[in-house]
Amino acid sequence: MMDYNEFKEGLAEDLINKGFEVGIQPVTKTNGVIEDALYVMGRKASPLIYLPELYEQYEHGADYYEMLSYVSEYMAGYERDSHFRAVRSLSLDDVMRSTQKPIYSMLISRHENEELLKTLPHRDFLDMAQIYYVDLSEFGVQGTAKITNSMAEEFNLTEEELNKISGTNMRFAAKCYDLGDMVLSFGNTDLLTDFLSTGSIPESAGMFVLTNEGTHFGSGLLTQKDLLDRIAEMLGENMYVIPSSIHELILVRADSVPDPEILKGMVHDVNESTVDEKERLTGSVYHYDRNERSLSIACAEYAQDRNLKEFASPDLGREADIERIELDPTDRDRHAAPRRDPAEEYPAFTDQKDQEIGYRQPKRDKGYEQ
């Protein structure tokens, strides 16, 4: 059996021998994860095929030559497939200069992404960071691209403007489902009842999932204060927020949890055993107080160590060490949702500015302002 380096170099060489102009480049993901990816050289936008995922399949018995054949067909399809044609013709200039910019936000861990955050416009949000991305679906591509400092500067967008635009776009993006139903549906949200659409949450729903329509980067919904207030009003009580992943959050009625440390232990265990490292959000548990309209880190010991601060204004500086956020009163895989199967995802795409564009593949046949 080949080791990882032999595998990646051999795959690239075999593809070159088949006539493909490919190279290998490291791609920085969230939480400090760096993965090697195959890409087509000399293209404005190219498929990125992540090699660690392929090697893992190889280690578990997948035939190397069948994998080579699949990657070859995939690369060939890039030249003729209509969806790929949309990707090849995609221009970030068109996206960023459009009248209704498809900009949204997501949350990532501050501690685990210190280096990445140096390259991205962002603001602190408790022990997380709020970053921004563009949704390319309106341009015929099921994908996203993180907004970097250089992109924001090129298109004359400040962090404050990004925050405002994303908040407007995310206003109607939220979906709330029963966790048990979502697990049983294997993530097929077409089969689920959206509590935000019905306007009520049944008592039988002990845990429920907060995400967006595409169940992709849904963690950013935690920044939407009106949304949290609406859900708490539907519950009629306070709630805990479990950071399931960067894609979704799990909400729990506070009265049903005698000690938030129980939830924190659950988060730790699931992060270690189930959630892919690059999709982990944090190890914290958060508490939403319905009466105070505030979101805070639930673990009092952590808050004390970090010098808990309270703010009455939503206009918080990006560099503030914030462990509690007061909302403006005038403004009115087990416990997580099912993980994505890597075989059901497109590789990411990158353009000439080296911006990663991750997008998902259909199954194949076989903010509140701080």
Residue ranges and their predicted role:
Residues M1-N17, G187, L191-S219, S273, ...:
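Terminal alpha-helical anchor/extension segments at protein ends
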Residues M2-G23, N31-E35, Y39-M41:
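N-terminal, positively charged regions that mediate nucleic acid binding
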Residues E9, S219-E233:
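Short amphipathic alpha-helix segments
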Residues V22-I24, E237-V241:
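A short linear hydrophobic-aromatic micro-motif
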Residues I24-V209:
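Charged, alpha-helical interface segments at or near domain boundaries
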Residues S244-L281:
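C-terminal structured domain segments
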Residues H268-R306:
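TerminUS-proximal long segments
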Residues P314-Q370:
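Non-Sec secretion/translocation targeting segments of pathogen effectors
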